[in-house]
């Protein structure tokens, strides 16, 4: 079957390409379902991390690997004998990789998509559900001042969800194009370009009840902590190998440091509900919808010039 495969290159760099002879998964048996992929979405941060050998990456000796992703929209083509809720023809979002066929238990990390949901938008339900999970984990309250750092897909959707929870959101980035999209969506109360010395000029000490970091810029931890009030919350989401900050800075403020892991089915269901009602907008974040045959070009861009991409959906 076709899949997207991470491969090592002679110069120790990596590429991700479409291959046509990957082993097809066995099954379905028991309560498993088998789907044929319609769309899959790139998870920009995680998949780039894997391409550059980061903390989420397979080791060199494990290459090549197949699939490697968690945003898949597919149609059920077979069901196991114990399947009770899903049927052939159902269209699902699944936390599964870039592969032509997927086999997964029907009680796995998936949801059945209503007909009213655009399937291309659903191909980004993984990253957008991370945004849902993060806002819930941050325990945002009505009227709280929240700084969201990073206007990629997750940050943009987190701004929408946090605003829906009643928070007063400032969304910042150094990418003017992404900030323009945020302005067009209109969820954040303030959209701020912090390129150059913008952070020092615009982000006041202790100005926020919570800071949510989707950017993962190395060495920025003290700046994030300085932006929260006494007993404020700092939520680290973007991938890091190590988190290093000045202990006395955090101690004096009695800060709370939080992380969260991925998302669950409840996050998916609530995200889907909000998208269906038009309360969360994904369409403005989709920049490229391309045949999966163009994967190498897309992943070379993700590896080398990641800011050129935003939402990318592969058509299978």
Predicted regions and their residues:
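Glycine-rich phosphate-binding loop and adjacent beta-alpha segment
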Residues: 218-279, 316
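Glycine-rich beta-strand-centered segment in the early N-terminal region that forms part
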Residues: 25-42, 54-96
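C-terminal hydrophobic helical "lid"/dimerization subdomain
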Residues: 222, 265-316
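N-terminal Rossmann-like NAD(P) cofactor-binding module of classical short-chain dehydrogenase/reductase
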Residues: 93, 212, 235
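A structural motif shared across PLP-dependent enzymes of the aminotransferase-like
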Residues: 44, 95-107
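Mid-domain Rossmann-like dinucleotide-binding core that forms the NAD(H)/NADP(H) cofactor-binding site
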Residues: 118-194
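A short acidic, Gly/Pro-enriched loop at the edge of an enzyme's catalytic core
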Residues: 201-211
């Amino acid at each position: 079957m076709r899949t997207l495969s991470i491969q090592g290159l002679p110069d120790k760099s990596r590429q991700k390409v479409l291959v046509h002879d990957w082993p097809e998964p066995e099954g379905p048996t028991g309560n498993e379902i088998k789907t044929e992929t319609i769309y899959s979405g790139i998870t920009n941060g995680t998949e780039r991390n894997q391409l550059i050998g980061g903390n989420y990456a397979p080791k060199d000796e494990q290459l090549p690997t197949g699939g490697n992703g968690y945003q898949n929209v597919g149609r059920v083509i077979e069901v196991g004998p114990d399947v009770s809720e899903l049927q052939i023809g159902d269209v699902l979002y699944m936390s599964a990789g870039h592969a032509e066929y997927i086999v997964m238990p029907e009680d796995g990390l998936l949801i059945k998509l209503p007909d009213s949901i655009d399937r291309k938008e659903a191909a980004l339900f993984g990253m957008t559900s991370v945004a849902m999970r993060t806002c819930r984990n941050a325990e945002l309250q009505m009227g709280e001042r929240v700084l969201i750092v990073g206007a990629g897909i997750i940050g943009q959707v987190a701004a929408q969800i946090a605003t829906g929870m009643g928070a007063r959101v400032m969304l910042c980035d150094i990418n003017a194009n992404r900030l323009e999209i945020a302005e067009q969506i209109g969820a954040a109360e303030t959209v701020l370009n912090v390129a150059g010395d913008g952070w020092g000029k615009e982000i006041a000490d202790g100005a926020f009840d919570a800071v949510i970091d989707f950017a993962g810029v190395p060495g920025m931890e003290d700046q994030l902590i300085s932006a929260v009030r006494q007993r404020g919350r700092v939520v680290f989401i973007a991938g890091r190998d190590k988190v290093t900050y000045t202990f006395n800075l955090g101690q004096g403020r009695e800060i709370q440091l939080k992380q969260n892991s991925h998302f669950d089915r409840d996050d998916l269901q609530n995200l889907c509900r909000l998208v269906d009602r038009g309360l969360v907008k994904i369409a403005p974040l989709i920049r490229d919808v391309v045949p999966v045959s163009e994967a190498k070009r897309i992943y070379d861009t993700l590896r080398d010039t990641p800011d050129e991409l935003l939402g990318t959906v592969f058509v299978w």
